[in-house]
């Protein structure tokens, strides 16, 4: 059994481990959410957010892993003052060598009644967005177009991340999730970092270049990249932020 749990944030360092352990002992597996959103200090200041000091975050996550509690860390693509390099650095930081760890990437949304969704913020951070039919929170993705009535607004460029950089970050980010979370290159990336001092994203960027330049040599990886590129196009075209793509044996 797997239970999706929405954790109350104030329990993070207090009751959360005890609750997760109790569920685990009862035979219910659940992932513990660790939300960072960003590791870039300028970005955190802009969105008025404070995270645990990164060393405390590592220690807390490690303590959960020591109890065989699985975690996933949340990052957001498209936040103000985030750059391609700072976003990549954040992914490097959340990639744990432990099998209990994983992470996910959300696209920055312009939500009603938030400070980011004001003319002042839009102008200050030069925010460029796309309007997409709402599919992110739906559990069924086969609804007809007429059934998708809600529209969501996603950030695709800011003053510090151009549209081309956002596209690059999208491809790098979601490809890295496939390579890391599904353990396709998990051990390779950990070996390169441990033995040769190479950050995981260096390997991911190298792999993307190799696959795109030599698609015949890497057909499965190329198909996986193509699906990510297709999904990215759906966002940029304003079609959908999440849609099932054709599965022809890719990632």
Model-found features: residue ranges?
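Phosphate/diphosphate-binding loops
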Residues: 3-7, 89-94, 105
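Flexible glycine/acidic-rich beta-alpha junction loops that bind and position SAM and/or redox cofactors
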Residues: 36-37, 41-48, 77-85, 97-163, ...
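Radical SAM enzyme core and accessory elements
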Residues: 153-251
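Structured mid-domain segments that build the active-site/substrate or prosthetic-cofactor binding neighborhood
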Residues: 57, 71, 94, 131-133
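Conserved SAM/AdoMet-binding glycine-rich loop
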Residues: 1-73, 77-79
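A generic secondary-structure signal for well-formed alpha-helical elements
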Residues: 68, 98-101, 176-180
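An acidic site on a long C-lobe helix of protein kinase domains
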Residues: 53-56, 86, 165
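Short, electropositive alpha-helical surface patch
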Residues: 19-24, 84-99, 167, 171-173
């Amino acid at each position: 059994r797997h239970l999706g749990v929405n954790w109350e944030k104030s329990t993070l360092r207090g009751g959360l481990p005890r609750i997760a352990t109790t569920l685990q002992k009862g035979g219910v597996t659940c992932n513990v959410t660790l939300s960072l959103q960003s590791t870039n200090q300028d970005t955190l200041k802009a969105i008025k957010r404070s995270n645990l000091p990164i060393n405390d975050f590592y220690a807390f996550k490690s303590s959960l892993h020591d109890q065989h509690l699985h975690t996933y860390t949340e990052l957001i693509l498209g936040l103000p003052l985030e750059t391609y390099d700072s976003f990549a650095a954040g992914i490097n930081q959340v990639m744990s060598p432990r099998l209990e760890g994983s992470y996910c990437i959300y696209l920055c949304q312009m939500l009603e009644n938030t400070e980011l969704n004001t003319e002042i913020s839009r102008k200050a951070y030069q925010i460029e967005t796309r309007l997409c039919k709402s599919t992110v929170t739906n559990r069924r993705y086969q609804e007809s177009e007429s059934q998708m009535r809600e529209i969501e607004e996603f950030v695709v460029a800011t003053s510090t991340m151009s549209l081309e950089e956002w596209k690059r970050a999208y491809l790098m980010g979601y490809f890295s999730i496939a390579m890391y979370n599904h353990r396709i290159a998990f051990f390779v990336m950990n070996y390169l970092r441990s033995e040769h001092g190479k950050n995981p994203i260096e390997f991911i960027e190298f792999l993307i270049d190799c696959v795109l330049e030599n698609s015949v040599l890497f057909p499965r990886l190329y198909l996986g990249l193509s699906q990510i590129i297709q999904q990215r196009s759906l966002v940029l075209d304003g079609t959908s932020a999440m849609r099932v793509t054709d599965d022809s044996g890719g990632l």
